[in-house]
């Protein structure tokens, strides 16, 4: 599915790169593993190739899809009337999908709220993490300009 050198996105961790595909033996069973270096933490993660689909790891978004996401980021509606506990759960679920559009919506909504009033500590941390995940992916999209990246700030 993925090749060495592919840029990927791992939900809740951000963008990374497939550095190797290695065979390891664990409990007397040999398995192929993707060796992924995560760009945010510089941590190396090993995921069995057989579990890659269930891990929700996906390729980095392309520039065409990004234009649609930028439009939603700038013009999409935010639901500001939800109680914070419900909003926090919805936003957590969105981030866990690993989809760039869902993450961008979380960043957009929390940034809009932050302009109106201070976020509580949990939502501030969520905004910081979601923004970091978003930027980590934007930085590796082929053909993206610095201006496009800054439009998410």
Swiss-Prot record:
GO biological process per UniProt: rRNA transcription
Pfam families under this entry? CarD_C, CarD_TRCF_RID
Q: Which Gene3D superfamilies match?
A: 2.40.10.170, CarD-like, C-terminal domain
- Domain of life of the organism in this record? Bacteria
InterPro entries xref list: CarD-like/TRCF_RID, CarD-like/TRCF_RID_sf, CarD-like_C, CarD-like_regulator, CarD_C
Which protein family is it in? Belongs to the CarD family.
Q: Per its record, how is this protein called by name?
A: Putative transcription factor YdeB
Native source organism of the sequence: Bacillus subtilis (strain 168)
Source organism phylogeny: Bacteria, Bacillati, Bacillota, Bacilli, Bacillales
